[in-house]
């Protein structure tokens, strides 16, 4: 089954991400990975990760839950990445970020 990413929230200090996805129903996945799943990405879950653009990537999925608007709003409001000031300077202001390649193109 293919899943489509609707939106993603990243917590850069711990490397955890949350994505709102659409498959057979709308869901929220909580995961850790070295890749970023931007909105519009289409992937297939497999035993040890996901297949994205015909390539398999390891991913640790901690939980999958039915989409809940209130929970998603809470996750979005606590989003640390990207901070608003960074859009002006093109520099990440998070000294504790553990993500090696910024999905937002910040340095």
Swiss-Prot record:
Per the record, the GO terms for biological process are: cellular response to starvation
Family membership noted in the UniProt record: Belongs to the IraM/RssC family.
Q: Which UniProt keywords apply?
A: Cytoplasm, Stress response
The record's annotation in HAMAP family points to:
Anti_adapt_IraM (MF_01199)
- Look up keyword Magnesium and say if it applies: no
Subcellular localization, as worded in the UniProt entry: Cytoplasm
Which top-rank group of organisms is this from?
Bacteria
Say what the protein does: Inhibits RpoS proteolysis by regulating RssB activity, thereby increasing the stability of the sigma stress factor RpoS during magnesium starvation.
- InterPro entries with a match to the protein in the record: Anti-adapter_IraM, PmrD_sf
Output this protein's name. Anti-adapter protein IraM
Q: What is its main location?
A: cytoplasm
